[in-house]
Amino acid sequence: MAKCKRNRNKTKRNFTVKTPTANQNYKDTVFRMLFSDRKNLLSLYNAVNQSDYNNPDDLEIVTLENAIYMGMKNDLAFIMDTNLYLYEHQSTYNPNMPLRDLFYICSEYQKLVDKKSLYSSTLQKIPAPNFIEFYNGSMVAPDCTELRLSSAFEHLSGEPKLELIVTVLNVNVGHNAELMQHCNTLNEYAQYVARVRHYAADMSLDQAVER
């Protein structure tokens, strides 16, 4: 996987507009459909983490009960090796992903931990969170970058006392070759989106999707 670029204080990212653009709904639907399958999701997990797990049942899918309320309908959340992973597909650049993920993870931890146990003298263990965004919008972006919650803090002085980092992986054709090589489903999805974009330049999006 490509090494991510870090930028703690600047909110401006290396994203520039490129045309033509396509409606994001079809991409969201296809991505969610493909990786709701445990086998495909495990393949994606292995590619991202450079691991070689082979039992899809090792994935513990987390139910996103508050996903609709939070506008996070494209999420895939699961626990693997006592770590909690939140995968989100995005067709547009969204600098607010760290804040959205903070709201989600706080809600999820509330479900995982017995509130009464918070008043005990025993340290309550929780899954370590990991936030990954798979970006395939029409704006030019690096292979890998990071969005930080601290970028939203006003008048931040010194190191932030709270941080949340979202790793953004560009999954457009021509990006993250190693990731694509290790997850064939993701590679095929990227090829599909590229074809639709190509056809959409000369016909309606509905026709391009069906072609």
What residues fall within each predicted segment?
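Elongated, amphipathic alpha-helical interaction scaffolds
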Residues: 2-211
